[in-house]
Amino acid sequence: MGSGYAKKKKEAKLMERQFMEMEASLEQKRFSGEAGNGLVSVTINGKCDLVDVRIKPDCLDPEDPEVVADLFRAAFKAAKAALDSEMSAMQMGMPF
């Protein structure tokens, strides 16, 4: 096993450490999304765990309860897009 193998192994260890640091950093961050001009807001962490949900009473319509579900889905999608954007930006600095 020549020095090429040792170099590749060292690079792999470095990438693994960078990836673990990126994961740890993301876990500490919060990403928010909202829908309906702020009627529903959702916050997730870097692992995509739901951290907070806020629903303003104005969107609670007993005649159309599906509105809240639609707004929740849209707010979650926006928060997930923010997380995905952050992950993409972080991965740009990774050597793979």
Swiss-Prot record:
It is found in: Cytoplasm, Nucleoid. Pfam families: YbaB_DNA_bd. GO terms for molecular function: DNA binding. Keywords: Cytoplasm, DNA-binding. It comes from the Bacteria. The keyword Cytoplasm applies. GO terms for cellular component: bacterial nucleoid; cytosol. InterPro entries: YbaB-like_sf, YbaB/EbfC. Binds to DNA and alters its conformation. May be involved in regulation of gene expression, nucleoid organization and DNA protection. Belongs to the YbaB/EbfC family. Homodimer. This is Nucleoid-associated protein CT_335.
